[in-house]
């Protein structure tokens, strides 16, 4: 122990004070570091919370955007359908060129015809080919020319009408069935476009172009176009999901509805040609290639069998009593088309049909545009099965221009998705302003035409 004044006492005292002071400093540094750590934790927590809120907002915005574009598609479908059918009803009262629907109604008794509403709907919506389908639903295919129409569609109408023979009921049921299948076709095209392009805006514009396509009112009355489009788009949706046999089955049903359904074989024929090309280049045919070719051939047969079976039934019923039975390929469908509608190569190229060619330009020009736009450097060029779509569209264009009543191309092209994709893509994403303007112009012209077309249909005026 040291007394006060001893040098060692002061040294110990100084050490003690320094020790206490260093402890205070350490404590203060610890508190500062702790505060900094807490601040860092708070900052990271805030950042994480902000990220979560941003992701939540992004999800909400994505969902709201999805619902927005989906709502546009639904509204477009409802608006176009109601508009066309309403105009047809109005025009059927203002100006009627032909009384065939009324005469047919007088020849066939109907309880529903006693109601003014049902009678008005029948004489407004049942025109042209729709009368054939109603009559076939009542009596079956009695006449040779009726074999140019689908035998499945009248059976569907009859089934939905509970096998009734009431022509008014059958006619109205056929229209509402068409509207239903038109809705399915719209939704299938929506899902198909969304699956391929993953772009909601592109999907919505595709559906808008489809709803206002030149097929117009024929998608909502007792015609086969809407059912054919539904089977076609559903088949394509399964095809891109690599469910090829179900796709082939749906396309075979499309062939039962319209004979041009056989062209869906292109989607199996093109890969088969590619496989053969590879085998020829390598001068060998492997087991896997053989199995692929057999698979493609089987799928093509699934699509073709309904068409040729229907031709066989016609041959069995009418032959050997008619001239076409003696042909090398005795098919009833092309025979009655030639006999009753003068269908054949360049037979429609007459001066009096120039107006019908002008009507057909509504489809011819956009299809030509779709072909060139898809081949060019657009995004569509990289689409996997673009070659099959190009061949299908080119084939439709060739047959429509040179082998049939050209204005029918406006209806037949309703099941060409490439047409709507190219128009929608050009309208939204084309680099050239002229191409964007062209897309908007086509949409405007289609809307104007379909409104006029609905009025002409209600008045029983061409084009049909």
From Swiss-Prot:
Glycans are attached at residues 108, 139, 326. The chain crosses the membrane at residues 71-91, 167-187, 220-240, 261-281, 290-309, 357-377, 389-409, 441-461. GO terms for biological process: GPI anchor biosynthetic process. Keywords: Endoplasmic reticulum, Glycoprotein, Glycosyltransferase, GPI-anchor biosynthesis, Membrane, Transferase, Transmembrane, Transmembrane helix. It is found in: Endoplasmic reticulum membrane. It is an enzyme of class 2 (transferase). Its EC number is 2.4.1.-. Residues 1-70, 188-219, 282-289, 378-388, 462-464 are cytoplasmic. Pathway: Glycolipid biosynthesis; glycosylphosphatidylinositol-anchor biosynthesis. Its main location: endoplasmic reticulum. Mannosyltransferase involved in glycosylphosphatidylinositol-anchor biosynthesis. Responsible for the transfer of the second mannose to the glycosylphosphatidylinositol during GPI precursor assembly. This is GPI mannosyltransferase 2. The gene is gpi18.
